[in-house]
From Swiss-Prot:
This is Chorismate synthase. The lineage of its organism: Bacteria, Pseudomonadati, Pseudomonadota, Alphaproteobacteria, Hyphomicrobiales. Belongs to the chorismate synthase family. Reduced FMN (FMNH(2)). One of its GO terms (molecular function) is chorismate synthase activity.
Length: 362
């Protein structure tokens, strides 16, 4: 199975399966002399960790990260710092229940990657989905914590802005509220609504989709490159690679199709520190290059495919059958995608910073 690596200069390779011994990643291209400890990475992993509320999978994983290589104690400062060598990270799996999947080992779960993995490789890991499981995203979050260290002047934040058909009231947007509710929602009132709404979905054994918005503040003008190395191209690809994501937009995205040229234009005026934009429909990127405004992206997460309702499917022999999925699953996988989105955008920005320096210096 190829294509387990993303990035150009700041490269991340992930490995491991949902029900394997461990998962992990190797980060290659991280600059040297950056202070880095396991605690720096653990903070981000704890936000994504499963089993923290009734609204996420009840699989209990501590997600304790171990740094295996790429760091050492600096002889002068006494701080643990990166050396420029590949940084290997390991997270042990401790709460697998493979027996929950024994009844479906010969059946394809609708909406999952079971059929396509089987069609391509002739084999699939039916125990929790293997590499296609959201469990893999813990390694991305770990890599993202390192990426944040590479771009310390940039703040990458994400929030859940829609669940099912219900959107937040953007007039109530409060970043401080994101950490105060189990949905990472910036609208306090809507977060309360989501509790009852998702409880109903969960008790019915079903699931629901969501929309996540990610914003990067502090990205300077000039990152990215024309045509085939666009900043928004890489952000879109990174977000699209997250499990269960089915759509990505930058800035106003698909809504711009309903606007006129006058409405969509991000007009400019002279400011004390250079040109100032009067709006940000473009999401902080024009021609594939950052404008200095906040970089904004959104993505849609489909409903979790593993639900308790019986569904029609076929088995490996091509016979019609029904399937009932057991196991522990997120009623809204979009909740835990918030921290994953931040990590992926942070990795893209770290990659583009290094590429930018390589092209123009500084």
């Amino acid at each position: 199975m190829s294509f387990n690596t993303f990035g150009h200069m700041f490269r991340v390779t992930t490995f491991g399966e949902s029900h394997g011994v461990a998962i992990g990643c190797v980060v290659d291209g991280c600059p040297p002399l950056i202070a880095l400890t396991e605690a720096d990475i653990q903070r981000d992993l704890d936000r994504r960790r499963p089993g923290q509320s009734r609204f996420t999978t009840q699989r209990q994983e501590a997600d304790q990260v171990k740094i295996l290589s790429g760091v050492m104690v600096h002889p002068q400062s006494g701080l643990q710092v990166t050396t420029g060598a590949p940084i290997a990270l390991l997270i042990e799996n401790t709460d697998q229940r493979s027996k929950d999947y024994s009844e479906i080992k010969d059946k394809f779960r609708p909406g999952h990657a079971d059929f396509t993995y089987e069609a391509k490789y002739g084999i699939r890991d039916y125990r929790g989905g293997g590499r296609s499981s959201a469990r893999e995203t813990a390694t991305r979050v770990a890599a993202g914590a390192i990426a944040r260290k590479v771009v310390p002047g940039i703040t990458v934040r994400a929030a859940l802005v829609q669940m099912g058909p219900h959107q937040i009231d953007r007039d109530n947007w409060d970043w401080e509220e994101v950490g105060n509710n189990p949905f990472f929602c910036p609208d306090k009132d809507k977060a309360k609504f989501f509790e009852d709404y998702l409880d109903g979905i969960r008790k019915n054994g079903s699931s629901i989709g969501a929309v996540i918005e990610v914003v990067a503040d502090g990205v300077p003008a000039g990152w990215g490159a024309p045509i085939y190395a666009k900043l928004d191209t890489d952000i879109a690809a990174a977000l699209m690679s997250i499990n269960a994501v089915k759509g990505v937009e930058i800035g106003d995205g698909f809504a711009t199709a309903a606007l006129t040229g006058e409405q969509n234009a991000d007009e400019m005026r002279a400011g004390n520190d250079g040109p100032s934009f009067l709006s940000n429909h473009a999401g902080g990127i024009l021609g594939g290059i950052s404008t200095g405004q906040p970089v904004v992206a959104r993505f849609a997460v489909k409903p979790t495919s593993s639900i308790l309702a019986p569904r029609k499917t076929v088995d490996r022999d091509g016979h019609d059958t029904d399937i009932l999925t057991k196991g522990r699953h997120d009623p809204c996988v979009g909740i835990r995608a918030v921290s994953v989105a931040e990590a992926m955008v942070a990795c893209v920005l770290a990659d583009h910073l290094i590429r930018h320096r390589g092209q123009i210096g500084g």
